[in-house]
């Protein structure tokens, strides 16, 4: 890099992800603290919040930092329906800023761009003016811009209720961090697959819907008033389905009132996602 760029200290980054994150948290990995090396931390796997390595690190003022956040996660996360939302995305980055002041880089992962316009737009706005960004203000402005001053507040309320409809399969363990654990659409699909397979190839109930050593499901039955993980999945998703169905019904009522162009965007970015999650969770 020095030869190609001609710079004595070309800017580089190292992505601290997966096992590297575990090694950092355990104190086994020590990247050099250089003003030309961005320490690019990553949200935790399967559920997207700052991992222990970031929460335990306090960077020198001269150490540049970055962050990798999964809006979509093609394993157990959001895939066809936005699950994380602007508030959670913002809180992840605010916790990065608590670690050190020199934030240089932010990466959001989203393969299906069409399904995540709200959260991706929120991220773009946040990075444009990180200091002044606020998710509530962004949501109000986003909805007013796309759906007009008359209907914008109604759509904003629907977005809030949609994101809060997700089943939270265990209680948050980071103080002041709501919606830390979510049962995303792919978790619903994986759980249905595992339960159907178990009817053909029975396995002990204690092994069903486990974490597989990587936090695959992260179900705590008692947090949902259940005795087993299977019962928790049934109860949690039934309740989530009712919440999503209520949001979908309100979307059905509002959609015909919107202008044609606004209606198409509304239907694809919110109404259909609420209906999908209602049907999948039922």
Predicted feature residues:
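Substrate-binding groove of N-acetylhexosamine-processing glycoside hydrolases
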Residues: 1-282
């Amino acid at each position: 890099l020095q030869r190609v760029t001609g710079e004595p200290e070309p800017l580089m980054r190292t992505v601290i992800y997966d096992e590297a994150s575990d090694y950092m948290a355990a104190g086994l990995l020590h990247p050099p603290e250089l003003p030309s090396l961005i320490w690019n931390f990553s949200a935790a796997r399967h559920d997207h919040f700052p991992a222990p390595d970031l929460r335990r690190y306090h960077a020198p003022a001269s150490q540049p930092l970055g962050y990798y956040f999964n809006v979509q996660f093609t394993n157990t996360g959001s895939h066809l329906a936005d699950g994380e939302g602007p508030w959670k995305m913002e809180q992840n980055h605010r916790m990065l800023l608590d670690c050190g002041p020199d934030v240089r880089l932010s990466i959001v992962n989203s393969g299906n761009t069409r399904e995540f316009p709200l959260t991706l737009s929120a991220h773009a706005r946040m990075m444009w003016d990180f200091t002044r960004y606020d998710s509530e203000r962004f949501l109000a402005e986003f909805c007013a811009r796309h759906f007009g001053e008359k209907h914008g507040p109604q759509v904003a309320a629907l977005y809030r209720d949609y994101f809060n409809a997700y089943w939270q399969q265990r209680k948050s363990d980071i103080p002041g961090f709501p919606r830390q654990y979510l049962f995303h659409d792919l978790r619903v699909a994986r759980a249905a697959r595992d339960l159907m397979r178990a009817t053909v190839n029975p396995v002990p109930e204690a092994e069903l819907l486990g974490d597989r050593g990587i936090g695959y499901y992260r179900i705590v039955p008692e947090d949902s008033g259940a005795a087993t993980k299977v019962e928790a999945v049934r109860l949690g998703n039934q309740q989530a389905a009712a919440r999503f169905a209520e949001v979908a019904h309100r979307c059905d009522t509002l959609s015909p009132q919107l202008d044609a162009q606004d209606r198409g965007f509304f239907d694809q970015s919110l109404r259909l996602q609420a209906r999908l999650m209602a049907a999948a969770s039922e």
